[in-house]
């Protein structure tokens, strides 16, 4: 039984919260980390803390994504671990939703995931090794009122991950989708004192991602649901 090992990670849609927790965990495990976001100014402190490198990229633009992978390859190494954390939202009564806002939400949540995954897979297939992780949400499996665009994007991302897992697992690429069913704790958003641990801790989520990455190929997870102990489902 062999535990997979990874050397270079690329986190797309990086920011504070889960992405930061993942960057810290991976850097502690001696994995080189690249962070990608539309605006990288916000990533300065995290890069200083973890030794990660930041790259500007619009994940919905095919040329930008191809350029991103080229930059990471030249300046760090070819990623053998890719995490897609980006998501887009547009909320409101169904008849009030602007088509352009809906299209953008779907593009960020799902189409960007396709573009990033395609570039990753092209590089992983020759070595028959790699992992691609997608961050989903409650909306990956449940469409909420006045949140159709988010559900559309997250449903599509889940379908992408499932299709990829079925095609690519036999070729040595571990594809996994995570349903984050609940609010993630942050400095700006935390639970009430009388409801301890009623929100997801980003460090705990990152640890679950890591546990999936350590799975031997004889027992791979393709989807994992994570929620606080008091979350109804």
Predicted features along the sequence, with ranges:
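Conserved glycine-rich cofactor-binding loop
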Residues: 15-16
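Catalytic loop of short-chain dehydrogenase/reductase
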Residues: 131-156, 161-162, 166-169, 184
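Active-site loop of short-chain dehydrogenase/reductase
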Residues: 6-7, 78-79, 93, 124-137, ...
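Conserved glycine-rich Rossmann-like NAD(P)H-binding loop of the short-chain dehydrogenase/reductase
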Residues: 29-45
